[in-house]
């Protein structure tokens, strides 16, 4: 590999989240290959984290960042987390993780995500603090308390009209309903369409999905607009998604402002001090 790659400050090596999402029977996807629409060859997704760790072990950046869905911390998936910790330790890093939510980080979207931060062991000494009775870790402040931004502060409420099959339920909504599924259960006494969530004016936008028809406005019979999808994900309105629909692109990514907040904390708490020491 090129020499400059062996002198990285941060390696962001996040891995695909679909196999760790709590939506659906995720265990069925473990150990199986998947083809992406972007054109990559068929590959397993549940072990890509370990290829990322192998890359970190080779390049030895100062800091390694992984991001994934909160489902990674639940159920049988926790075994992956244990293995990630073990392999990162072997790669020469002290690893920590936090469950963060974009809504507290200047992003107008409810998007909980797990962030793993690893600091190279030879750089840790000045930052070490006692985490608990048994563990010492490099200190970093990962508390975020930005004011929440509700839907009505930015929405144009101008998405694609919902179809008649959805409209017949939407017309019977009440303030307590959080999804079309709540109405289906009340009217038809069956479980369906709970993934079709309502967006309410005075609430933070729900998690953006890779599919347009997962979110619809409570006060307007339409799905979330491209305009709102882009702004709720903190992309510029003129961003080039390279032919992808904004719902898919935004649903598959970390909001840039969320990532910028994490990077700023890494700089403030670790890298700025390391750089200062290197220049002394």
Kindly label every feature range from the protein language model.
Residues 159-280:
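C-terminal target-recognition/interaction regions appended to catalytic cores
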Residues 11-14, 52, 64, 116, ...:
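Conserved small-residue
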Residues 2-8, 18-198:
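Class I S-adenosyl-L-methionine
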Residues 14, 103, 119, 209-211, ...:
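Structured loops at beta-to-helix junctions and adjacent beta-edge loops in soluble globular domains
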